[in-house]
């Protein structure tokens, strides 16, 4: 789902934190402490 894709994306960028939200069928992802 959205959260797992976001987590994998941020992990790939070596970010320590991440946050995701689904809105109107779209996945929004934000990576922190990269």
Curated annotation (Swiss-Prot):
Keywords of this protein's UniProt record, alphabetized?
Antibiotic, Antimicrobial, Antiviral defense, Antiviral protein, Disulfide bond, Immunity, Innate immunity, Secreted
Q: Which domain of life is it from?
A: Eukaryota
Disulphides: 2-27, 6-29, 10-31, 15-34
Recorded source organism is: Mytilus edulis
- Where does the UniProt annotation locate this protein? Secreted
A biological process term (GO) from this entry: regulation of defense response to virus
Q: Keyword check for Ribosomal protein, yes or no.
A: no
> Under what name is this protein listed?
Mytilin-A
User: Might you report a single GO cellular component term?
Assistant: extracellular region
Role according to the record = Has antibacterial activity against A.viridans, B.megaterium, M.luteus, E.faecalis, S.aureus and E.coli. It is active against the marine species A.carrageenovora, P.alginovora and C.drobachiensis.
């Amino acid at each position: 789902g959205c959260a797992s894709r976001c987590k994998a994306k941020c992990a790939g960028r070596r970010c320590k934190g991440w946050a995701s939200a689904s809105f109107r069928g779209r996945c929004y992802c934000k990576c922190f402490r990269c």
